[in-house]
């Protein structure tokens, strides 16, 4: 799958006039503060996917090549989501999402390393879409559904079926 294919929906959303992007994913929980079934607002991310969707030819008048990523995820949208969840008696956690390429799950040693560098959750999506939306100047909120605990955190083996059932 190419970066262009992965970010196609962001291009389409921009062409349709969208100013905001709501991105969701299923992720493995690394942090001890997370449990299966939790929702986690992504405050920041770590891109270890081995690439960047802004590399290469991008033919769009609105795209910014060298874009600031200091606040890629909109704090105002995060505050609104937290307020709505509190008003409805639902807790949403916050944390740092780390993206890796799949399709294999991580090893316990990799998860220990990811925890050390500050990751709360890990997945195989979201970052390319967020980077492209940010390059278009869109406001972004991203939310992970913690579908499983990462390798070595839970004694249970990981499976795609578990991820599917819990999302």
Question: What role is predicted for each listed range?
Answer:
Residues 108-150:
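A C-terminal functional module that forms or caps the active site or interfaces directly
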Residues 62-73, 99-101, 111, 115, ...:
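Polyanion-binding loop/helix "lid" in catalytic or ligand-binding cores
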Residues 1-69:
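Metabolite-binding pocket within alpha/beta catalytic cores that recognizes anionic/polar moieties
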Residues 21-25, 41, 92-98, 122-124, ...:
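General beta-strand structural signal in soluble alpha/beta enzymes
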Residues 66-88:
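Internal active-site segments that recognize and position negatively charged phosphoryl groups
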Residues 151-167:
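His/Asp/Glu-rich mid-to-C-terminal helical/loop segments that flank catalytic regions of hydrolases
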Residues 83-120:
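Active-site/ligand-binding-proximal alpha/beta "capping" segment
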Residues 38-43, 139-142, 158-161:
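Short, hinge-like loop/turn segments at secondary-structure boundaries
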């Amino acid at each position: 799958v190419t970066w262009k294919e992965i970010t196609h929906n962001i291009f389409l959303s921009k062409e349709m006039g969208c100013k905001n992007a709501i991105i969701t994913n299923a992720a493995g929980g690394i942090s001890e503060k997370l449990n299966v079934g939790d929702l986690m607002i992504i405050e920041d991310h770590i891109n270890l996917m081995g690439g960047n969707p802004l590399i290469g030819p991008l033919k769009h008048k609105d795209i910014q090549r060298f874009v600031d990523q200091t606040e890629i995820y909109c704090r105002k949208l995060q505050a609104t989501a937290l307020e709505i969840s509190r008003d409805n008696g639902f807790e949403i956690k916050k944390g740092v999402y780390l993206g890796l390429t799949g399709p294999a799950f991580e090893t316990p040693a990799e998860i220990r390393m990811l925890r050390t560098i500050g990751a709360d959750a890990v997945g195989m999506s979201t970052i390319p879409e967020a980077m492209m939306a940010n390059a278009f100047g869109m406001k972004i909120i991203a939310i992970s559904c913690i579908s499983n605990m990462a390798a070595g955190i839970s004694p249970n083996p990981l499976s795609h079926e578990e991820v599917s059932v819990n999302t």
